[in-house]
Design a protein with these regions (language model features):
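Long helical/loop segments within the catalytic core of UDP-sugar-dependent glycosyltransferases
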Residues: 31, 108-129, 133-135, 139, ...
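Short beta-strand-to-loop acidic/aromatic patch adjacent to the donor-nucleotide binding site
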Residues: 139-150
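A short, conserved beta-strand element in the Rossmann-like catalytic core
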Residues: 92-94, 121, 148-151, 178
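Cell-envelope/extracellular polymer assembly enzymes that use nucleotide-activated donors
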Residues: 54-57, 85
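Acidic donor-binding segment of Leloir-type glycosyltransferases
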Residues: 73-119
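Acidic donor-diphosphate engagement hotspot in glycosyltransferases and nucleotidyltransferases
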Residues: 72, 97, 152-157
């Protein structure tokens, strides 16, 4: 049996690689463990939440997403929350979104919708839609989500609002992917989870750097 031997250079490279691996593993362990510790503290009642439920404006920017609006918007409109409005900014006029939103407004008086002008071609239409939603809002606290997202329950808005305090500037949430079959779906779901854990971990460490609109 032939034994493997390493010269000095190889030993140094091997030691350096092992050290970097350990540092990287400890880095991710400390970062992601913050999420676990936070979740455990919430379950044990060790986290203070606001008892007030301030009025909230929910803003949804939708670009020709009639099917998503049909599937998810009612779940947002029917949240168990004392005072809130839902503002949908419709970007595009090639589907039935406008007709559907107009119909829903007759049933839900707290729903309001507007549109992005077709002449707006040289700026980010998503940013413009969000700006229009903010300008149309009546309340100080703003909640952003997307037409493709569906709340897990009618308590979604309450769970967000309990974090609204005088010391809070931004509340970050997590939006997962529905379970599905296939390697590609699992890869997308994993990437989404990994990204979310990273920005939530940094936020809990006091260094927030990003969030997503879902």
């Amino acid at each position: 049996m032939e034994a493997f031997t390493f010269d000095t250079t190889e030993q140094i490279l091997l030691a350096a690689t092992g050290t970097l691996f350990i540092i990287q593993a400890l880095y991710y362990l400390c970062l992601y463990n913050r999420i676990h510790l936070r979740s455990r503290a919430v379950k044990r009642g060790n986290v203070h939440f606001s008892q007030e439920l301030p009025p909230v404006s929910v803003i949804i920017c939708a670009r020709e997403e009639c099917e998503n609006l049909r599937r998810n918007l009612k779940a947002v409109l029917e949240q168990d929350y004392p005072q809130f409005e839902v503002i949908v900014i419709n970007d595009g006029n090639t589907d039935e979104s406008e007709d559907y939103l107009t119909l829903l407004e007759e049933k839900y008086p707290h729903l309001y919708h507007s549109f992005v002008p077709d002449s707006s071609r040289y700026i980010s239409r998503k940013k413009l839609a969000a700006t229009l939603g903010v300008k149309a809002s009546k309340y100080d606290w703003l909640v952003f989500t997307e037409a493709s997202c569906c709340p897990q329950s009618n308590q979604w808005l309450r769970l967000l609002a309990r974090n609204f305090t005088s010391r809070t500037q931004v509340v970050l949430g997590y939006s997962g992917y529905e379970r599905g079959k296939g390697w590609l779906h699992k890869r997308v779901a994993f990437d989404n989870l990994f990204t979310s854990m990273r920005y939530l971990g940094f936020a809990l460490a006091g260094s927030p750097y990003m969030g997503i609109g879902r």
